[in-house]
Amino acid sequence: MTTQKIVPTKSTDGSKLFRHQAKFVAGAMNINQIPNFSLPEIAFVGKSNVGKSSLINTICNNKNLAKVSNTAGRTRQINFFNLADKLIIVDLPGYGFANVPISVKEQWGVLISYYLRNSYNLRLVNLLIDSRRGIKENDKKVADLLLANKREFQIIFTKSDKVTDHKNLHDEAQNFLATLNYSCNVMYVSNRSKEGARELKASLAKCIKFQK
């Protein structure tokens, strides 16, 4: 089992795509509110407070694009951002711990699951993992859901500046992917140092075959 390494090229350099300005276009708090865009969609999913919104702001070069909070569970809807009519970036609510009633957690679970199962234009899912915590049971369940629905995904270890050795994370990811019999990109990103941002942009541009 090996992971693919993203090497930005002239045709897939994400900086060309992400030099455009992204804007918020829709929010969905239930499945009936999920819009149907005619553009490719790329989603970001992970546990509460893993850094989804911050990462979206980093790659879009706009710290105010997606609302960021230090309190887990504050993203309570699916947020959709349009990047220059080339791509829809999807910020999903965090799963796992959230200081909200069980009924609300269940509602989020239904919303996330429905979107991942049914989005016609979904091209890639970025499964975000906190580098300090490693891969947890909820992350494994999401990966199983993605594979069951033939969704392509890549693993993004966030807050990479908080750990000094990536080898253990790499080994953990390799072992995890081996159990799934799946191969994908594994990246390390930091919103503070911007580590991995260029490679992530390149992978997204490559996914939608952006070349101009």
UniProtKB/Swiss-Prot annotation:
Keyword Ion transport annotated: no
Q: Which domain of life is it from?
A: Bacteria
The positions annotated for binding GTP are 46-53, 73-77, 91-94, 158-161, 189-191
What keywords sit in the KW lines? Cell cycle, Cell division, GTP-binding, Magnesium, Metal-binding, Nucleotide-binding, Septation
- What positions does the entry give for Mg(2+) binding? 53, 75
Q: Which InterPro entries match?
A: G_ENGB_dom, GTP-bd, GTP-bd_ribosome_bio_YsxC, P-loop_NTPase
Cofactor(s) in the UniProt record: Mg(2+)
Q: Which GO terms describe its biological process?
A: division septum assembly
For molecular function, the Gene Ontology terms on record are: GTP binding; metal ion binding
Domain (EngB-type G): give its ranges.
38-210
- Database matches in Pfam families: MMR_HSR1
PROSITE patterns per record: G_ENGB (PS51706)
The job of this chain, per UniProt, is described as:
Necessary for normal cell division and for the maintenance of normal septation.
NCBIfam families in UniProt = GTPase_YsxC
Return the PANTHER family for the record.
ENGB-TYPE G DOMAIN-CONTAINING PROTEIN, MSS1/TRME-RELATED GTP-BINDING PROTEIN
* Protein family: Belongs to the TRAFAC class TrmE-Era-EngA-EngB-Septin-like GTPase superfamily. EngB GTPase family.
State the name under which the record lists this protein: Probable GTP-binding protein EngB
Q: What is the scientific name of the source organism?
A: Rickettsia rickettsii (strain Sheila Smith)
